[in-house]
Curated annotation (Swiss-Prot):
SMART domains: IG (SM00409), IGc2 (SM00408), LRR_SD22 (SM00365), LRR_TYP (SM00369), LRRCT (SM00082). The chain crosses the membrane at residues 632-652. Residues 424-515 form the Ig-like C2-type domain. It is a single-pass type I membrane protein. Residues 525-619 form the Fibronectin type-III domain. GO terms for cellular component: membrane. This is Leucine-rich repeat neuronal protein 1. Expressed in brain. Residues 702-716 have a biased composition (Polar residues).
């Protein structure tokens, strides 16, 4: 009896297998479209649960329409890399369809995909099509959709209710489209969204509260969006966010205010941004942060004091491949007890302080290879390392300085050199050698230096003033880190600024040459005159007397203008407290030389000249026809004749009068001008008689009179 029962059970198993085989055979043969592959394949749900699904694979067949003989049991339909641009009703009988892949086809509109009644669909791939917009309710029938991949399209417009009905959506890929704005209303219909990739869109900027409806979001990718700033409240509402990427943007500083609004962030990617320095407070009180990436930053030069502060769960920091990163403050880390891995390779670091490493009690591995290391007292701790810290790729750690050790392995050199003090060395990439600034801007020059003992840093201005942390000035301010701030830059602020790093062993210096609007004033030149504005009939000049001249002893300044055509020379005395002068009633398109001489009570003089050409005059007269021109010429000719006769009469009368009082003016006259005297500005100048008279009266005593400075522009 037992044998009979066992045999019966075996028959049932065989029969079941036969039925299953026949069913699968029908799917794989009679109902499988030509050239497609139909089979049972492993399939993972959006929650990564393993299942097996009936799959029809029609990828890469250059199809222009969906095959018509699809089985209603199809669960996964793969139509990637075809030429399909529109469907009719081929999908309507696929009631069990859970995944549909239309990527790399020719759809331009979502409605043409034919998604109605696909209530079981959980995953939809529409990437790499030609879709340009998403209209309201275009996906409303996909109530069970959990994954939507619509990246790498041409989408420039998404209506406010485009995602209506997608309350179960978990993953949304909108990256690599043409979106210029991010509308928070999109996300009102997707409260359960966990992953959002919206990078590589040319958005104008991120707004405050942009992602507020996404309280369940765990991962946000904002890569490649040309972002220059992140508003302080842009990430408000993302209380569940664990991973955030700002990879490959244009951020020039860490968006610290925005990051403080993401309390549960664990992974932060700031790689490939032009951030200049990591400053105090940039990463502070981020209590859940575990990994931080600041790699491939072309402009990063320093990690300053307390840049990473109170990060109790941070275990890994990557700061690699930063070609200008040359300085890490000895107190860069504070209250970072869990850090195990510190990657600092392929930078421009000369050293890492022992105190920096000692501030990380749980450090297990450090990578500082492929840096231009200085093999002196600053890195002696490497040779005397008594901890369990492991150096990554130690054979790639070579000395770059001092010159006698260049190219040798670090450990071999440190055995020979055991000095405890060494000279300061200014990090060469912290500030540029040359800069050109615009008038009115503010300049920051970051000077950083490493030495034992720690050096003092101060700056010297182009005129020799020493700027320290204690200096009180509206123009200059020096931070304890060594950053010089120059406010409201003017042309007279141009010149050579010298950073000095000094300790008991000596000093190191480095110079930054600053131009303002393309102008560079020589710091050794006490006086400098320059042109501020040029018009067709006027020139506005200004000058600067550097403060290392005893300006309190300067009694007079004189300006001499030489006019090439017509040739007129005059001088005018200007009080020292006037630094700007307007020379008017000049000739258009004419070359002039303006010279300024400054003298003190000891008769010491400084002279500065500038060449300038007035602009071409703008003529408003426009004669439209020949007859009008002829008539006008006749009238003007008549007027010219009358004026000429009158001028001759006046001239004869004046010559007659001149004979009567010639000697009373002789001491003021040297040369005759072809420009009317009453049109020259300033009005009080020294004149010379014509050459014929000058020969007769060459011995006359000439004394320039003081200029009426009430008509000059007083700026200081």
């Amino acid at each position: 009896m037992a044998r009979l029962s066992t045999g019966k059970a075996a028959c049932q198993v065989v029969l079941g297998l036969l039925i299953t085989s026949l069913t699968e055979s029908s799917i794989l043969t009679s109902e499988c479209p030509q050239l497609c592959v139909c089979e049972i394949r492993p399939w993972f749900t959006p929650q990564s649960t393993y299942r097996e699904a009936t799959t029809v694979d029609c990828n890469d067949l250059r199809l222009t329409r969906i095959p018509g003989n699809l089985s209603s049991d199809t669960q996964v339909l793969l139509l990637q890399s075809n030429n399909i641009a529109k469907t009719v009703d081929e999908l309507q009988q696929l009631f069990n369809l859970t995944e549909l892949d239309f990527s790399q086809n020719n759809f331009t509109n979502i409605k043409e995909v034919g998604l109605a009644n696909l209530t079981q669909l959980t995953t939809l791939h529409l990437e790499e099509n030609q879709i340009s917009e998403m209209t309201d309710y275009c996906l409303q029938d996909l109530s069970n959709l959990q994954e939507l991949y619509i990246n790498h399209n041409q989408i420039s417009t998404i209506s406010a209710n485009a995602f209506s009905g997608l309350k179960n959506l978990l993953r949304l890929h909108l990256n690599s489209n043409k979106l210029k704005v991010i509308d928070s209303r999109w996300f009102d219909s997707t409260p359960n969204l966990e992953i959002l990739m919206i990078g590589e869109n040319p958005v104008i900027g991120i707004l405050d509260m942009n992602f507020r409806p996404l309280s369940n979001l765990r991962s946000l990718v904002l890569a490649g969006m040309y972002l220059t700033d992140v508003p302080g409240n842009a990430l408000v509402g993302l209380d569940s966010l664990e991973s955030l990427s700002f990879y490959d943007n244009k951020l020039i500083k860490v968006p610290q205010l925005a990051l403080q609004k993401v309390p549960n962030l664990k992974f932060l990617d700031l790689n490939k941004n032009p951030i200049h320095k990591i400053q105090e407070g940039d990463f502070k009180n981020m209590l859940r942060l575990k990994e931080l990436g600041i790699n491939n930053m072309g402009e990063l030069v320093s990690v300053d004091r307390y840049a990473l502060d109170n990060l109790p769960e941070l275990t890994k920091l990557e700061a690699t491949n930063n070609p200008k990163l040359s300085y890490i403050h000895r107190l860069a880390f504070r209250s970072v007890p869990a850090l195990e891995s510190l990657m600092l390779n392929n930078n421009a670091l000369n050293a890492v302080y022992q105190k920096t490493v000692e501030s990380l009690p749980n450090l297990r591995e450090i990578s500082i290879h492929s840096n231009p290391l200085r093999c002196d007292c600053v890195i002696h701790w490497i040779n005397s390392n008594k901890t369990n810290i492991r150096f990554m790729e130690p054979l790639s750690m070579f000395c770059a300085m001092p010159p006698e050790y260049r190219g040798q392995q670090v450990k071999e050199v440190l055995i020979q050199d055991s000095s405890e003090q060494c000279l300061p060395m200014i990090s060469h990439d912290t500030f540029p050698n040359h800069l050109n600034m615009d008038i009115g801007t503010t300049l920051f020059l970051d000077c950083r230096a490493m030495a034992e003992p720690e050096p003092e840093i101060y700056w010297v201005t182009p005129i020799g003033n020493k700027i320290t942390v204690e200096t009180l000035s509206d123009k200059y301010k020096l931070s304890s880190e060594g950053t010089l701030e120059i406010a409201n830059i003017q042309i007279e602020d141009s010149g050579r600024y010298t950073c000095v790093a000094q300790n008991v062993q000596g000093a190191d210096t480095r110079v930054a040459t600053i131009k303002v609007n393309g102008t560079l004033l020589d710091g050794a030149q006490v006086l400098k005159i320059y042109v501020k504005q040029t018009e067709s009939h006027s020139i506005l000049v200004s000058w600067k007397v550097n403060s290392n001249v005893m300006t309190s002893n300067l009694k007079w300044s004189s300006a001499t203008m030489k006019i090439d055509n017509p040739h007129i020379t005059y001088t005018a005395r200007v009080p020292v407290d006037v630094h700007e002068y307007n020379l008017t009633h000049l000739q258009p398109s004419t070359d002039y030389e303006v010279c300024l001489t400054v003298s003190n009570i000891h008769q010491q003089t400084q002279k500065s000249c500038v060449n300038v050409t007035t602009k071409t005059a703008a003529f408003a007269l426009d004669i439209s026809d020949h007859e009008t021109s002829t008539a006008l010429a006749a009238v003007m000719g008549s007027m010219f004749a009358v004026i000429s006769l009158a001028s001759i009469a006046i001239y004869i009368a004046k010559r007659f009068k001149r004979k009567n009082y010639h000697h009373s003016l002789k001491k003021y006259m040297q040369k005759t001008s072809s420009i009317p005297l009453n049109e020259l500005y300033p009005p009080l100048i020294n004149l010379w008689e014509a050459d014929s008279d000058k020969d007769k009266d060459g011995s006359a005593d000439t004394k320039p009179t003081q200029v009426d400075t009430s008509r000059s522009y007083y700026m200081w």
